[in-house]
Structures are given as structure tokens and as C-alpha cells.
Amino acid sequence: MGSESLETLQVILSGGEFMLHTSVWLVPGSLLSSHPVFTFKVKQENNGPTFWRRKVSRTLNESSLRSQQESSTPFKDPTSHPSDLKELSPAGQGTSRPLPTLSSCQSMAATDMPVCSLSLASSTNEPQELPDPRDAPREGSFRLDGNQSEFGLGNSLPASPLHSCRNLEKEESELHLYIISATSSIFLHLKSSWNNYIIRATLLQDPLCASEHNDVIGKPKPYRSEEKIKHFCQLKSELFLKDNTLRKILCLITELRVAAQRNFILKRLFWKTSELFYFLVNKLHEYLPESRDKHALQNKSQRADELMACIEIIQTLGLMFRETEIESSRLNTLAAKKGTLFNLLVILISKPKVPKSCSKSDAQPVADPTSAEVFFDSQLQKLTLEYTDTATALLYEILLIFQQGNLGLGSTKFAISWMMSFLQSCPPIMAFVARIVEGVVRGLSASFQLLTPCQAVLLYQQFYILRSCLQHSKALAEYIRNDHREEFRYFIHMPALEQRLPGCYPITEPTTQLCHEVLQLIEQKQCAKC
């Protein structure tokens, strides 16, 4: 299809919201019989747009006919460019970018081509400004059903009777997107952007994260671009000093992470100056899985400081990976020295080595529970668990890169399979997968307290990694089925998930879908053995 036959779709994520520009692909009718179809739907009331969700089911012939009719008549885009939103806002209100919710969809009956619908709207009951995540809509799903390309993201809550009645008064407009290839970059970016939005919207339900986010968007930015660049260069030069202490490095990395949270430009600079990425990975290698300083193998206080610094480094790397899919410099940095990326993978799956516990001894009774030794033993245990959770989050981000096939390793399937093949060749991977399963069990068992937003996101990431292992690695799949059969039988099941995962979290539905897929992958193999 020539470039003159389509208009580009740009879907980007900025500040936790989507900005949707001119959004239609004009596809020749001859191509409609073999390609996925997406339907972006917009509903609008007389007093302005509002959130909604609705299932869409339409045959292929109807969609093709409608496309031909639309192509023969002038098309009127029902959505407005962000610059035109002011005209839609009531008097006295500012402008805003509409925040989308994605409605559920059904596969077309005629073929296996997926059809998806997006509802795009914003509330008009309050001034048009960036919405409080706690007031954001709690419903919406984004689902693609097709061969090897099925995913479900989003969350939905039962609509109230009043909400259902109001839906009857809304006008409906449709905007069709015909996806030529499910592995196209725009399609992968669309999925990735929605996934980023789901995670961010869930995390912002945590009061602490929400307050930090409101502080960032509610205050004028204190620096101009030149000053941000100068700040970044200063941090980088100070980090590269040879006489830095561990505490100094920790402070500088924390400052870098906080600055990157406030200004996206620092993420861009981080990937453009690849030396800093290599520096942080090499710094991790100094302390993990064991410290190069042999004194730290006996000094628990020093080892605790090292683990705290490593956790901060991994959190900073995770922040730099998050929401930077469209940065070409990131791909260039990762592809330039693949060895550094694979060294990072080995570090993430390796359990940190800590000094042996001195609380018990064959020749001595239990140590005084108030002693420093017992305190540091407990501290090291907590830091080890925190390290595993932080490493899981970063491994998830790297897994997304290979899932999208963005490293030039061939097709998407080959890329993720190549990564899983590398991981299963690493001796620490079995123990890491065991820690992942233990983390899921820990999250779904014990008390019946609801998971926090951060715990819910971590659970989603854990299930995503387990599903990837089951789908793309025979060795890891067999290990999970054989060595963790009891965990999936008694602790990891849908009722336990429903009890612990609040329905108001946007990430609840995709996590439930992931859990269901993981259980299905395990049960299918067990049935095959029977």
C-alpha cells in the first residue's frame, strides 16, 4: 500500500494520557479480507463528550461496505485535534487532552481478523485540566483476538443504572483503523502505550504516587531545556568521578531518578549518552551477585549499603526503560553492545549473596533479638526480597523489548524465543523463576488484605514473566509444571486472585487475563500427559 493511500496515526503517551491526532487508515477494499480491523469509537452527548464503554460486533462484509462508502464520500473526523479542544470546552473552562478508555471487542465472525474499539472522551463536569487519577474512569478494556496476537488490557466495573440510562442519550461516531500487520510498529506502539497507561493509572491510585504526580504536573517547571541538559551533564560527570564513595553514588543516582521523573528530557538524554547506561550496569556488576570487596562478605552493614545502592540503580534503569519505546536512541544503545544488556539479564536473575546469618549456631544459643547482628540479618532479608521485586520489574521492561522484536533480531517470535533461550542457558534462572512463583504465592495467600497498587502492578509483571516462560521456553515450562505443581494447585488460582485484587484498579482485568492464561498453559500440558 502506498504512502499516499493512508493518513498516519499517532498515539503517544504523555503525562499518563493519550493524545490522539488524525486517526484513520484508508485501506483498499481488496486488503480487507486478510487484515485485522480496529474500530475507534467516539460518543458525545449534547453537553460534551463523556466516558463510555460498549461491545462492538460487526461482520466483515458490513465493515468492508462501510469502508467503501466512507472512501467515496468526504470523511468528517468526529474527534478534534488537541489544539481544537478549546472549542469543545464549555465557557470558562480550559483545554485538555481527552483521556481514552478502551471498550471490549469481539472477533469478527467471518474471519480470524480482530476488531477492537476505543472510546475516547473526557469529563466535562469539572474544569478541563489533567484529571486526578483517583477520579479517572474505572472501566475500559483493550482486547485483540487473533492468531498469536491476543491480549487483554484494562478494567471494567458494572455500570450503574443511571450510567446505563445516560448512555441511551449519546450519539455514536466510528473511526475505523485497518491494521495491515499485527507486527507493525504503529500497532506495537499502540499496545505498548495502552499498557503504559494502565500501569501508570494503577500506580497513581497509591496516595504517595498520586501526590508526587500532582506535585510534578501542578507546579510550573523550574528549568528550561538548557538547564535540564546542564543538570544532566553535571550529574553524569559527578558519577564518573573515580574517588566517589558508595554513599555519594547512591545520592547522585537518586537525584538522577527524581529528576527523570519530573522531566522526560532526562530519559532522552540518558539513552542518547549511552555511557551512563553502561556505567550503571558495570556498577551493578561490582556488587552483584557478590561484592568485589571481600570485606563486604563478612560486614553485614556494608553489604546492606551495597544492596540499597543496587536497588536504587535498578529502579533508575526501570524508570529509564518505562515509556521510552519510541526513543530510537534507546534501541541504538541496547543494540550497540548487546553484551551489556545480556550481562544485565544475568545480574537481574541472580540472587544477591549476603553474609551468613549469625542468629543461630551449633555451639551457641539463639542470639539476643536486640543485637546488631539480628537487626542486620533481618535488614538483609528484606533487602533481598526488595531486590527480587525490583529486578522483576526491570526484567519485565526488557522482556517487552524482545517481545516487540525491537533489537533487530528478526521477527517478534524469534526475538522473544532468542531471549528465553539465552535465559534458560543461565544457571540462576531456575532459582529466579522459583522466587517469582514464591512472590505470587506470597501476594495471593496469607492475610486477606487487598493488594496495594504497587503490589498489583508487581503481580501483573510476575504473571507476564511466567507466561513468557511457559510459552517460549520448553525447559522453563517443564520446570514450572513439575516443580511448582502444588503452588498452582493450592495457592495460585482465580478465587484467590479475585479476593486480593481490587476491582477498581485498571490493571485488574489484564492481570486476571494473564493469570487465566498461565493456568491454562499449565493445565493443557497436564491434560496432554493424561
UniProtKB/Swiss-Prot annotation:
Disulfide bonds: none annotated. Residues 60-103, 121-155 are annotated as: Disordered. It comes from the Eukaryota. Coiled coil: none annotated. Residues 60-74, 92-103 have a biased composition (Polar residues). Residues 131-142 have a biased composition (Basic and acidic residues). Pfam families: DUF4551. This is Uncharacterized protein C12orf56 homolog. It comes from Mus musculus (Mouse).
